Amino acid sequence: MSSGQSFSRSLMKLPLSLLVKSTSIPSNPVEDLNIDLSKPIVYALPFRSSVDILTLQKHALELGLPDPLSKLEINGKSLQRYVFISSRKTLLQDDDYVPSSSIEVFSELLSLHAEDSELDVQVIPATVLWGRKPGKENNQKPYLQAMNGLEKSKAVLLAGRDCLVRFSPVVSLRYMANSHGTDSTIAHKLARVARIHFSRQKLAASGPNLPSRQALFDRLLKSEAIKKAIEDEAESKNISIEKASKEAQDIMDEIAANFSYSLIKRGEKILGWLWNKLYQGLHISNASTVRKLAQDGHEIVYVPCHRSHMDYLLLSYVLYHEGMVPPHIAAGINLNFFPAGPIFRHGGAFFIRRSFKGNKLYSTIFREYLAELFAKGYSVEYFSEGGRSRTGRLLQAKTGMLAMTIQAMLRGMNRPVTLVPVYIGYEHVMEVATYAKELRGKRKEKENASLVIRTIRKLRNFGKGYVNFGEPIQLNQYLNEHAPEWTKDIDPMGTSKPQWMNPVVNDLATKMMTHINDAAATNALTLCATALLASRQRALSRDSLVSQINCYLSLLKNVPYSDTFTVPKDSAEDLVKHAESLNKFLIESDTMGDIISLDRHQSILMTYYRNNIIHLFALPSLIAQMTIRQHGLSIDAIQENVAAIYPFLKKELFLSYDEDQLESVVANIIDELVGQGMLVVSNNQVTINQSNSQALMLLGRTISETLQRYSIALNLLAENPDLDKSDLEQKSQDIAQRLGRLHGINAPEFFDKGVFASMFATLKQQQYLDNDGNCDLEKTQQFAKLLYSMLYPEVRLTIQESIHQAE
């Protein structure tokens, strides 16, 4: 670097420190990108720019990375630590060649790799983005282009507070040298590949160019499918084509988003303030996987679970904060009220009616609009459950949007389409008390401005929030495996609905929901709620609660549920203290210490938070309950019993293990419970360690209400094998309600009809019932007996008595 360059850069540092407030993506590149600090590092930037290199320098030093302006010493040679892939524009010329100095650095590095087989230089592509505003659709400029001095000065002044420094995955020059050689042409090839990479970086951060709304409507009106639907509408209603077209325009206006970058930018600041006011921190996991998908050009469809209206805002905020484009969000038409509707619409929401069966014009327009979003490359988000979960459990998926996504693919899309499951968790859901009232029969209050104002007035500290991105599902690959000839059904009109569609969509929906649950976030409140609700009086001493949380943490860490779920790093003591700070527990003291308990009202509300993570403990809890109630079993008997019950748990709780994995998972859980001193194994027999039985009993009770529900249905069926499906569901629900009242079961889902309906689908799948509803009596009686054996005597007696009274 010349002395003139050094001097000019020194002069720039002060104004840049005042004008530029940039963000690093990812926030911890050393960990997220697996950068090895013991190996040499070189930075690659898209354009020659002193402003960019100084901005990069600031972040590199803050993040513990080498200074890009320091020299790189390798085997006695001193090299520049950065390269520019393109020259900078000037006022007089628009140069776009690769600077010779960069080619020299690449060539020198490759030759050093040829001489030293141990050398591995890491190239870190880094892009400094000044503003993230997407362009207009008719703009033919490239996504990423060099700026001359005046343009860069303007960018610093106008977008200095909206600057991103994006670090990309490391490129190993050792790998390049081994795979492609070390001659001089490889240096030019590296530069060409880097240009494409940097352009994709910009596209991933800003998104595709945006059309004007009217231009979008005009394009949709020209689609053959909508023209045909308008003609059919005019004919069926006996109105003119013009009137039917006006109706179509009104529907488009009702549906379509009106994305505004300025609102997103301002909204990010407002939401940042809101999250800081509401929550004690947002924990985000696995965002790097999604960034890579966006950068690789995937059409991304986000499918989050739906806990709260906050979900709409939270996911968009997190994606923007992580350097990605907020998606277009399918929102219920009930949210299209003033002033929320226009704000949501500018934030990317497009609105969907709850039902449009039989309305061909509406369904055609909605399908075409969704296909247009996919075709233009906008990421999309929809809540696969169809509505917010009132119980805290994941609901069975509504498959309509998923089917329309597949239909959009059948138009012949060029880019891969990928579903990204998202688990959203809270230590406080602001609607949870309302959910409890609705489950007790209160009518749902319609969303309106006054409801929003009342909610805002209640804003207070809600603990922590969690956004975990689950394992992506690449739809092209999924269809190749489950409908190998799907490409033969490609139809540009988008009307194709092949025979394989329904079964494939249903299986895909289950896989999607399973991946959401796989990414669950455990936290202080969900763990404490699980423990307290498992105690008979909803109360534990502080020592017992801490001990139980330690049991849960050890299980989750030593027998991990999945690759994408998260466990708190805090100690059990700290988790209990944090949960107490949320003011949801009663704390009383006596001479022996603190007792932490739940009152009746909070007991009902806490079931919501327990249900968020109940699937993580389903198998450990089942094994614990089995050994407690049967006082000792062989390992083979435990394996056999778990195999019988597992299909029902898997269907209801979207458990991730396949049946062929069960044996090893059960063995690992038993080993862990032995390691924790709760079980003893001798001569293949598993027994309880009586000196440490409380933790095992609390663990077992987590699943006991689920087993009670199964026991009601199976024993009712065993006693009355001729009952049809609707009678069986109704009688099971009635008995569950009675059992709940008699034994103080507060869980709202305990007698939920939907849960029973799901169970009966599994009865058919497992051949307890045939397709005509006929019962395999011997098999049913055997299973009913197994379920009875895992219940406490007083509960079993109530069920037996209720079944006889129901006959």
Swiss-Prot record:
Annotated motif HXXXXD motif, positions: 305-310
Presence of the UniProt keyword NADP in the record: no
Written domain comment of the UniProt record: The HXXXXD motif is essential for acyltransferase activity and may constitute the binding site for the phosphate moiety of the glycerol-3-phosphate.
PANTHER family: DIHYDROXYACETONE PHOSPHATE ACYLTRANSFERASE, GLYCEROL-3-PHOSPHATE ACYLTRANSFERASE
One example of a Gene Ontology biological process annotation: CDP-diacylglycerol biosynthetic process
GO MF, any single term: glycerol-3-phosphate O-acyltransferase activity
InterPro entries: GPAT/DHAPAT, GPAT/DHAPAT_C, GPAT/DHAPAT_LPLAT, GPAT_PlsB, Plipid/glycerol_acylTrfase
Protein name stated in the entry: Glycerol-3-phosphate acyltransferase
Enzyme Commission number, as recorded: 2.3.1.15
SUPFAM superfamilies on file: Glycerol-3-phosphate (1)-acyltransferase
GO cellular component assignments: plasma membrane
Homology family: Belongs to the GPAT/DAPAT family.
Keyword field: Acyltransferase, Cell inner membrane, Cell membrane, Lipid biosynthesis, Lipid metabolism, Membrane, Phospholipid biosynthesis, Phospholipid metabolism, Transferase
Pfam annotation, one family: GPAT_C
Chief location: membrane
Presence of the UniProt keyword Cell membrane in the record: yes
Known pathway: Phospholipid metabolism; CDP-diacylglycerol biosynthesis; CDP-diacylglycerol from sn-glycerol 3-phosphate: step 1/3
Compartments in which it is found: Cell inner membrane
Membrane topology: Peripheral membrane protein
Signal peptide: none
